[in-house]
A protein has these predicted regions:
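Active-site clefts of carbohydrate-active enzymes
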Residues: 1-36, 53
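Aromatic-rich peripheral "rim/lid" segments of glycoside hydrolase catalytic domains that contact
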Residues: 53-113
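Conserved, mostly hydrophobic/aromatic
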Residues: 50
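Acidic-histidine catalytic/liganding microenvironments
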Residues: 44
Length: 113
């Protein structure tokens, strides 16, 4: 299972100076990055699951937070509970097709043997 992956978007109010994830310009590009990464997992044939690292962006005012979790756009929602709709839509588009995609990749792999 793949855990704690994310892509940060510069189109947010956060500086994105912490955390190890990739950085892209827009929330739509975050969605494309999610799709690209998960398609690779499905194609590999050896991944049983995955989950996005954070539900909500890092809170830059959080006391005692780990230094890697201070000011980055890692969530599906911002700190005012607004959904990053382009990201969520891209996730939904892939997730509702995950089993069909896994089957398709399996068939392609079997056809190439």
């Amino acid at each position: 299972i793949i855990t704690e992956f994310y892509t940060k978007g510069m189109y947010s109010v956060l500086a994105n100076t912490t955390g190890a994830g990739f950085t892209v310009q827009t929330q739509q590009e975050r969605g494309y990055a999610y799709q690209h990464f998960v398609l690779g997992l499905l194609e590999s044939g050896n991944c049983v699951g995955w989950h996005w690292f954070r539900y909500q962006d890092n809170d830059p005012t959080a006391k005692g937070a780990d230094p890697s979790n201070l000011d980055s756009n890692k969530g599906l929602i911002d700190n005012e509970y607004n959904l990053y709709k382009p990201l969520a839509d891209a996730m939904k588009e892939l997730n509702i097709n995950a089993y069909r995609l896994a089957d398709w990749f399996d068939q392609q792999s079997n056809n190439n043997q």
